């Protein structure tokens, strides 16, 4: 029998009495109880069917029909007779199409299709079934908000969820909306998603791709007409196609699993009010205000704004859909999003969550000098509430001078990309904020500075990511991180080649003239790529990351971290040849987005054509006069510097004058240059006397810093050698008070040594007196030991010599074994007085074997054998041979890695009598020495000496010829 339908009641009315809440709770309880009862009855009926059916018998149509009918009738739902119609040949009563499109049959078919394969297939696909199940799980038993549902205590377990109505075959989208199911049709006319896309393939594509495949395509896009026609506003507010929610409607957004792309952006868990965002394209066109400057503003008129605001507070459906299916309309919006470049303007919701409210969104058009709209945030979508975080500098309400329209074109970009499809490289390359966002890197001469300030305010708005929220985070580094993805799409547009060209700008025209001036010479010297980098025209598919494009800064380049390797203040970045910034962008502290092709100093970015010709031409002989105007540049080059040094040795007076005039203004810079310092040294040698003197004057007041510099110290040494005495004295005096610092410095110690060598002793007394009391300490220093040796060589003052030698001789044993002090002792043995050598040898006597086995002291013992007298040498040899016939000290020395060299030195320096004695002792142990690594050295030396002695003896035994 037909089950009577209860009256349809709305979920909420503004003037309901207080008893509605109690009725509502009772209704919920009845529904829950009925659902449990239906489940129990269904289980019992299934068991009964299994009892009357043989396990081996195939399923029959009648059995399936009775089972299904019993489920529908016994379960309290509408029986199969409800569908009416004549019994067809398939065994089912009622209209076949009406029967097969019912969601209850769909669920039954997929649950029992294996038991009865003769069941006719339903009209809905599995995909539609999953959608219905999602809606059922999301809506539970309450249905959609504002729908008209049937309240029936006898619903079947397999009936459609509350809120679904079996619509007529010709039901339009507006009829579905009346039932609260926006954009979802489950009847016989329902199309699958594949059908929708295939049907939509015939529609013309009106949008251009947002990512051109090449740079040429990109240039064509940016040069195209940027005027936004009213018909183009149809795509405004299209949702991001992150899931099927954008295709099926807002009901899918009620899924318990939120879209990960919208988690951080959804302001509250409330449902989007049905009907609040449903505005047809025609309505949008009718309600859009026209700008007085022929630009399209995104704001609706006041009455429409009021209607939208009030509709956002209403929970009932409001209608207002297009005539075509809502699913197809949503699919078109998906396509509009994916190809969202509309003549240079993208009107897609940048926040990427399924927003059903198409509230007004603004656009910054080059022809629209009134900047309204651009709410920048869809957080308050559908609520009709204004953004509470809007700050007073927001560009939404700025009326800019039309004269700055050309500035707005490249300053703001057009937001082509959504954060979902942004370029990762542009995001990572973002630093504090590009100078172009602060108001532009270049200001036309005819534009007022106040308008530039307005542009700066627009840039400040963009620095907040377009969200309207103030910078309330305490950590500036985190604030930068938070807005990386928000501004990545702007960066791609800011890296547009037209940004660098900026056609029509007077300042850029001037730079173009400068560039053309050197273009003929520098055209063949394109900006070099880093070694190993591919010569590609784009990066990650973005045409803005090709050659000669703006180069973004690093996110680590923070003004609070000047020592960061990626900071603009880092030595790494300062020393990078290719990273030179235009003058217009040098005053900004964060990441600088300077052009790779240098605008401010063109000469620094490219090598001179003269220098390149010199290095590439191996056959032509150049002269100094031919490089006039390029001397400094040649001096800083490896090959150019060598060329100048060679030519200065034989240069004429005119050539020397030419070189002198060019290097003098850059003399200090060349002195510290890796190649330029050699040119300065050579000019000190071969320059004219007046020129050398004037060049020496450049050193005054710079001696100390140059002495501590790697290349400057060489220039100071050469100057001390060749300049006049008065200049030498003046230069040396600058070291007073810094002597010990220079002595311990790896560069300064060479300057101190040169002062001791070239400056008279009476003029460097302040240097020598500094060493008194520190001779031993300096003798054990890697650089100080060299200075002490120069003092012993060039300071002949008896008082100075006695003081220095007294400290050395008092610690001979310690200095002899020191890795640096041993050089000082060797120097005394070689250049000292005989009595000083005798004191040292006597100090070492009795410890010769021990000292010979020590690495550093063995060198001192060798010097004692070399420079000692015969008596001193005999004393050392006797100690080595020992007092017994076994010669134990000699055997130990011959097998030692260091002492074996001392034994070899003895065989070289001793007289014949001592050599014969030593050889006799060594021959006894010759076979045993061959087994030791270091003993082999002694064996080889002995064999040579024996062979030489035998030859000498043979020559002596020959009869002497008679003299006539």
UniProtKB/Swiss-Prot annotation:
Annotated keywords: Cytoplasm, Phosphoprotein, Repeat, RNA-binding, Translation regulation
Nuclease is among the record's keywords: no
Transmembrane regions listed in the UniProt entry: none
Pfam families: NABP, PUF
Localization (cell): Cytoplasm
Phosphothreonine modified-residue sites: 257
UniProt keyword Thylakoid, yes or no: no
One GO BP annotation of this record: regulation of translation
Region feature (Disordered): 1-22, 204-235, 256-300, 343-388
Annotated GO MF terms: mRNA binding
Domain spans labelled PUM-HD: 606-946
Residues bearing the modification Phosphoserine: 192
Repeat region (Pumilio), residues: 626-661, 662-697, 698-733, 734-769, 770-806, 807-842, 843-878, 879-920
Biased composition (Polar residues): 207-216, 223-234, 287-300, 356-384
Gene Ontology, cellular component aspect: cytoplasm
UniProt remark on domains: The pumilio repeats mediate the association with RNA by packing together to form a right-handed superhelix that approximates a half donut. The number as well as the specific sequence of the repeats determine the specificity for target mRNAs.
The protein's role, per its UniProt record: Sequence-specific RNA-binding protein that regulates translation and mRNA stability by binding the 3'-UTR of target mRNAs. Binds the APUM-binding elements (APBEs) in the 3'-UTR mRNA sequence of CLV1, PNH, WUS and FAS2.
Name the UniProt record assigns to this protein: Pumilio homolog 3
Naturally occurring in which organism (per UniProt): Arabidopsis thaliana (Mouse-ear cress)
Recorded name of the encoding gene: APUM3
